A protein has these predicted regions:
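Amphipathic, non-membrane alpha-helical segments in soluble helical-bundle scaffolds
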Residues: 1, 50-53, 76, 80, ...
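Short coil/turn residues that cap or connect secondary-structure elements
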Residues: 35, 71-74, 94, 110
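Alpha-helical membrane-embedding segments
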Residues: 64-75, 114-122
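Acidic, low-complexity intrinsically disordered regions
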Residues: 17, 45, 65, 75-78
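Interfacial loop at the N-terminal end of multi-pass membrane proteins
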Residues: 2-60, 104-119
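A mid-sequence interfacial segment
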Residues: 86-122
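Membrane-embedded alpha-helical transmembrane segments of multi-pass integral membrane proteins
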Residues: 12-19, 60-71, 84-94, 98
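Helix-coil boundary and interhelical linker segments in multi-pass alpha-helical membrane proteins
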Residues: 1-9, 69-80
Length: 122
């Protein structure tokens, strides 16, 4: 069971890394060429649709982190699970306190500077 939790955690983390790289390298740069009159609608759709993509793997990451804390697999140092949890917490806090407010600003008043800030803080 512990090994399966570790595999699910690894897979969900890899999915999130892939999504983040896609957003950084493809999606956010494309937002810079969206016409201003469409930017608010695009930003709203981005927020709504992104939740469907990132919600499940983020939930799996969170649950499996807790399970790994409770039952560290044999061969894995207990402190690695805590470092992993700390990194996950930092990523989540950056999303909540850096990315989400910038997305809200992008919906309210589309601006190229906000787009650059999204890339820098993601």
């Amino acid at each position: 069971m512990d090994d399966l939790v570790l595999v699910f955690h690894l897979v969900s983390t890899c999915i999130m890394v892939g999504v983040i790289w896609f957003v950084q390298l493809v999606h956010y740069p494309l937002l810079a060429v969206v016409p201003v009159e469409s930017a608010t609608q695009v930003a709203e759709k981005h927020q709504r649709w992104t939740g469907f993509v990132v919600g499940p793997p983020m939930a799996v990451e969170g649950v499996t982190t807790l399970l790994l804390w409770a039952n560290t697999p044999s061969g894995v140092s207990w402190w690695l699970t805590w470092v992993n949890g700390a990194f996950l917490a930092v990523a989540l806090l950056c999303t909540i306190f850096l990315s989400v407010p910038r997305h809200a600003r992008m919906v309210a008043a589309p601006d190229a500077q906000v787009g650059r800030e999204l890339v820098q803080t993601n």
